[in-house]
């Protein structure tokens, strides 16, 4: 079985034309069902609808969904920039981001957040696997850098 671009070659079959009696040999090709190149974005419409109803936290979530880069599921913005863009207080942004982090919806580093690719992403199965790995490592890299910085600080201090 040969797979190419989602198509699987299944062999050949002989068919008989009812009118002429001619035997025709045809190749049987089946298209493989794959997840393919997709954008999961149904949540955006739901959040938009809820945003119209109200809620400062929903405005922040909607802003994140509208501004996340679908190439890598990240958004570069400080909490102050998000507060200004959404017309919410800095404390509301901080609280909302903390809730999203605790719910494993986002992970954060200074000035950057990454949206969980299980919630929203664009791409195929391979890209989803890649983004899931990146999401898993996203916070870890920041923690390692912070630990290294603290280690350097304490070694310099002593």
From Swiss-Prot:
SUPFAM superfamilies: Winged helix' DNA-binding domain (SSF46785). The keyword Methyltransferase does not apply. GO terms for molecular function: DNA binding. Disulfide bonds: none annotated. Pfam families: RepL (PF05732). InterPro entries: HTH_CRP (IPR012318), Plasmid_replication_RepL (IPR008813), WH-like_DNA-bd_sf (IPR036388), WH_DNA-bd_sf (IPR036390). Keywords: DNA replication, Plasmid. It comes from the Bacteria. One of its GO terms (biological process) is plasmid maintenance. The keyword Chaperone does not apply. Transmembrane segments: none annotated. This is Replication and maintenance protein. The gene is repL.
């Amino acid at each position: 079985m040969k797979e190419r671009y989602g198509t699987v070659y299944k062999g050949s079959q002989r068919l008989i034309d009812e009118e002429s009696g001619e035997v025709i040999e045809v190749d049987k090709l089946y298209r493989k069902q794959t997840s393919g190149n997709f954008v999961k974005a149904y949540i955006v419409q739901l959040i938009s609808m809820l945003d119209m109803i109200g809620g400062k936290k929903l405005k922040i979530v909607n802003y994140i969904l509208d501004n996340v880069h679908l190439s890598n599921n990240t958004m570069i913005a400080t909490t102050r920039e998000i507060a200004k863009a959404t017309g919410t207080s800095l404390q509301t942004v901080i609280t909302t981001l903390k809730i999203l982090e605790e719910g494993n919806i986002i992970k954060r580093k200074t000035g950057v957040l990454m949206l969980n690719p299980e919630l929203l992403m664009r791409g195929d199965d391979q890209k989803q696997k890649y983004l899931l790995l990146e999401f898993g490592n996203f916070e870890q890299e920041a923690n390692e850098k912070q630990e290294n910085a603290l280690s350097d600080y304490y070694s310099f201090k002593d």
